[in-house]
From Swiss-Prot:
This is Small ribosomal subunit protein uS11. Part of the 30S ribosomal subunit. Interacts with proteins S7 and S18. Binds to IF-3. Coiled coil: none annotated. Located on the platform of the 30S subunit, it bridges several disparate RNA helices of the 16S rRNA. Forms part of the Shine-Dalgarno cleft in the 70S ribosome. It holds the Pfam family Ribosomal_S11. It comes from the Bacteria.
Length: 130
């Protein structure tokens, strides 16, 4: 019987990156936290879905907190100490994710809201009737 060879993909080299940028994309359905270096190369990322939440629970502040903690842990392993935070989107996990990054041990130097605002672009989705 043929044995399947164990695949070992290209391992990311552990590098020492002292400061970077945390991108928090918070929608009503999910929160994605990506931490990059100053050049834009992603160091660590996590999301509410990757943290084990499913369905409507992905949009909760607690799910955003868990995702931010997981991303911060991976970034701290790479030697990150200071971050700038760029927040995008209207979701409920915005503030919670920022607080979780701070509690995890990352020093926040800047918080900026980069939510895209349309100058009367696409038509909005129709109103929900429940």
């Amino acid at each position: 019987m043929a044995k399947t060879a164990k695949k070992s993909g290209p391992k990311k080299a552990k590098r020492n990156v002292p400061n970077g940028v945390a991108h928090i994309q918070s929608t009503f359905n999910n929160t994605i936290v990506s931490i990059s270096d100053t050049a834009g190369e992603i160091i660590a990322w996590s999301s509410a879905g990757a943290s084990g939440f499913k369905g409507a629970r992905k949009g909760t502040p607690f799910a955003a907190q868990t995702a931010a903690e997981a991303a911060a842990r991976r970034a701290l392993e790479q030697g990150m100490r200071q971050i700038e935070v760029l927040v995008r989107g209207p979701g409920s996990g915005r503030e919670t994710a920022i607080r979780a990054l701070q509690v995890a041990g990352l020093e926040i130097t800047l918080i900026r809201d980069v939510t895209p605002l349309p100058h009367n672009g696409c038509r909005r989705p129709k109103r929900r009737r429940v």
